[in-house]
């Protein structure tokens, strides 16, 4: 994929070379917490070069193998109607199991991918164009939507918007499948304006009613659950939407939204809150939105403009965003090259921390930000750190059991650790995963800083460890006579580790 087309002309500031802190900041903000070798690889690049490198390495397909059942067609309407109550309960249990397996597959992809930005943006669109397990019964449908978000993660927003409007998961989740002439359902029409494009206050109830008429006839086949258009249920009459009049269908309605300058600004503001800070700078935001719209809604162009703002690189905006549960768990695993047997335990931890993938709390998705942290989730985050250190194996030590480990006879999914290490630029022999559990080779990781788990770290090593894992100085005082293991664990327990 070409990167240069989306990159604006560089300002002098964008020619500044990255030091280690800059590299850690950029890779953490645009992906997940990076391994030390990832940071070392980009130190010395200019800001413009790292932006181009990151946008030029995005993917459209996963690198991991996903469950075979994703390709299975759902049962037909006749097959569903023929189920007995006992069969329905069994089918429900199987669907729930498959949803869990789907969550595990996605978390595994987040850990292994050589393009963390791809998965961050896939996750971003999952929270933006919300659909969920509570109204989408078959996980195959949600898997197809996830694949759509990955394919178009950094493509064209207009293309993505049109595709999402015809996506079977979305048609089920926002009741678009039941929208027909004479009985319009306004759910999707309202949410596409309020949550997906314009934002609150930029449309009227009349616009919602008319837009719903335009969307009539877009539904799903009851047997295949695939998108289809039914002309006999479409309202072909004239509609007036946001001041424009015509016999619009669903595509015509979406094109009206894409012509509105407010759509580019709404998406740019949401990207700002994802990658820069909770409060966008109005002038800089206008610049990003203008470039986004002028590019024809090229998502890479929006990100290139965003990451070229002074605000993005301003040291005052470092460590001001809270890591989502997925970022916290996946970032920790990537940062410390943690091996694992079954990715289900990682997906379960993400859910425990408050982000149940494929099951957002409501149509607005996860609120995010500071709301990720409360007394319960903070305790769970600390317990995950403790779990990592219980999974430590140094010379003469064995990996202990932990509460999330499945029984010994459980099926395990061995992560391709060697592939991950290669992608991350790690040298040496990768750690072997404990069966069904985690394995953190602390001794090998600390050796990068000439430290040992049971030896006193010393001031120089302590400073190196701080800069390797934190965006800010630790909030709490840490005993300067700590061993390497104790000091690193204290850093991960510090509030600063929750931030990016």
Question: Where do the language-model regions lie?
Answer:
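Active-site substrate-binding loop specific to GH73 endo-beta-N-acetylglucosaminidase modules
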Residues: 2-9, 82-87, 95, 99-106, ...
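Flexible, low-complexity segments enriched for small/polar residues
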Residues: 3-36, 264, 268-295, 304-500
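Hydrophobic/aromatic residues in well-formed alpha-helices
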Residues: 23, 39, 47-51, 208, ...
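Short alpha-helix boundary/capping elements
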Residues: 31, 59, 129, 133, ...
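N-terminal accessory alpha/beta regions
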Residues: 34-152
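A general structural motif at alpha-helix termini
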Residues: 43-46, 54-55, 164, 306-310, ...
């Amino acid at each position: 994929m070409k990167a240069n087309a989306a990159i604006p002309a560089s300002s002098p500031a964008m020619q500044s070379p990255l030091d280690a802190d800059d590299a850690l900041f950029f890779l953490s903000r645009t992906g997940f917490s990076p391994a030390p070798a990832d940071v070392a690889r980009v130190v010395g690049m200019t800001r413009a070069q790292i932006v181009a490198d990151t946008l030029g390495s995005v993917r459209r397909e996963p690198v991991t193998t996903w469950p075979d059942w994703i390709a299975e067609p759902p049962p037909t309407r006749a097959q569903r109607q023929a189920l007995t109550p006992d069969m329905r309960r069994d089918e429900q249990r199987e669907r729930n199991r498959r949803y869990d397996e789907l969550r595990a597959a996605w978390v595994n992809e987040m850990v292994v991918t050589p393009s963390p930005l791809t998965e961050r943006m896939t996750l971003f669109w999952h929270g933006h164009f919300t659909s969920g397990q509570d109204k989408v019964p078959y996980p195959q449908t949600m898997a197809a939507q996830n694949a759509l978000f990955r394919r178009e993660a950094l493509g064209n927003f207009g293309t993505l918007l049109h595709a999402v409007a015809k996506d079977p998961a979305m048609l089920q989740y926002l009741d678009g499948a039941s929208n027909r002439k004479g009985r319009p359902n306004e759910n999707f029409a309202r949410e596409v304006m309020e949550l997906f494009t314009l934002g609150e206050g930029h449309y009227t109830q009349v616009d919602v009613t008319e837009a719903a008429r335009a969307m009539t006839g877009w539904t799903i086949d009851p047997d295949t659950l695939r998108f289809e258009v039914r002309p006999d249920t479409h309202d072909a009459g004239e509609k007036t939407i946001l001041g424009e009049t015509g016999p619009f269908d669903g595509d015509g309605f979406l094109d009206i939204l894409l012509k509105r300058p407010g759509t580019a600004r709404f998406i740019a503001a949401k990207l700002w809150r994802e990658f820069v800070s909770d409060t966008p700078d109005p002038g800089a935001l206008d610049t990003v939105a203008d470039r986004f719209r002028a590019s024809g809604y090229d998502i890479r162009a929006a990100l290139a403009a965003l990451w070229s703002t002074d605000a993005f690189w301003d040291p005052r905006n470092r460590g001001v965003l809270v890591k989502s549960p997925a970022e916290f768990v996946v970032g920790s695993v990537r940062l410390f090259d943690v091996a694992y047997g079954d990715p289900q335990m990682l997906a379960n931890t993400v859910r425990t921390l408050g982000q149940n993938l494929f099951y957002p709390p409501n149509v607005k998705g996860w609120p995010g930000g500071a709301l990720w942290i409360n007394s319960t989730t903070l305790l769970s985050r600390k317990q995950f750190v403790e779990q990592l250190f219980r999974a430590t194996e140094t010379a003469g030590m064995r990996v202990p059991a932990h509460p999330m480990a499945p029984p010994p006879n459980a099926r395990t999914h061995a992560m391709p650790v060697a592939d991950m290490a290669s992608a991350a630029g790690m040298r040496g022999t990768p750690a072997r995963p404990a069966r069904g559990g985690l394995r953190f080779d602390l001794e090998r990781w600390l050796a990068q800083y000439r430290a040992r788990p049971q030896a006193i770290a010393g001031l120089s090593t302590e400073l190196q460890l701080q800069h390797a894992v934190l965006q800010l100085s630790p909030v709490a005082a840490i005993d300067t006579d700590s061993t390497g293991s104790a000091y690193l664990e204290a850093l991960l327990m510090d509030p600063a580790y929750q931030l990016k």
